[in-house]
Amino acid sequence: MNVEAKYLEKTNPFTPEPARIVRTYHLTEDVKFFQVRLLDMEKALAFSYKPGQFAMLSVLGTGEAPFCLSSTPSRPGLLEFCIRKAGTVTSALFKLKENSMIGLRGPYGNGFPVEDMRGKDIVIVEGGMGVAPLRSVLLYCLDNRDQFAKVAVLYGAKRPAEMIFREEYFSLKERGDLECHLAVDRDDTGSWTENIGVVTTLFPLLSKVKPENTYSLVCGPPVMYKFVIKELLKLNIPKNQILMTLERRMKCGVGKCGHCAIDYIYTCLDGPVFTYWDVLHMRELI
């Protein structure tokens, strides 16, 4: 490799790092779990990110796409992604087996303000694929449990078969140091023993919160936000302590292509985590 090539390799932000798929399996019919490690072990262990950030994954000959990190930085070395089959890149990823090679660059975005959240009550509200980015911050809170006050999770899915990381969430219910409430819109199995209804029906089950001492993290389908925010405001949680992770047409990850721009806001740089206060002033965000 000549000097110019070495220079470009180190300075070009679009150059992905080679990575290997360590483990992959179906979470649901159209959602797969991917555990990935950078080939360079030194870089793998040094890969630093915050919960809520994302990375670009690429498949040779197909292209690349942004995916939120579902792992936690408190467990270095391996990166985890929860991916739904929805397009060209995801279809190519779904065909790959364990030990297959992919490209990875990142991390990108702002992530959750975990330093500000320390010592606070944490209420996580998620629906459907909203689990993917919020799993990162949930695992981070569990790995650093003594640094946070109350932790509560409200998770809703359409059907039991569509509940992502189902076993993980049921295991959370066995823990004595957090709340975990689960719901499905409808039970087509006849064996579902948890709540039936949309995720907002879980709010009455939530133990009393101290609004000024609470951060709420929200992610789910667009239709969910309006109703969840309404419930959080009823609890008097401050608008700047309601955090929403929004992935809006992100393409390059570094604020160059303009695909995710809303006026002066770039989702890939200024987000994907926004406060409800931000959203009120940028209504196109949701």
Across the structure, where does each feature detected by a protein language model lie?
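Beta-strand residues in well-ordered beta-sheet regions across diverse protein folds
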Residues: Q35-R37, C82, R105, V125, ...
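Local cysteine-cluster metal-coordination motifs and their immediate loop/turn environment
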Residues: V223, E247-P272
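FNR/FR-type flavoprotein reductase catalytic core
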Residues: T88-K251
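Short Fe-S-cluster ligation motifs
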Residues: G258, D263, F274-I286
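Ferredoxin-reductase
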Residues: V3-S100, K158-R159
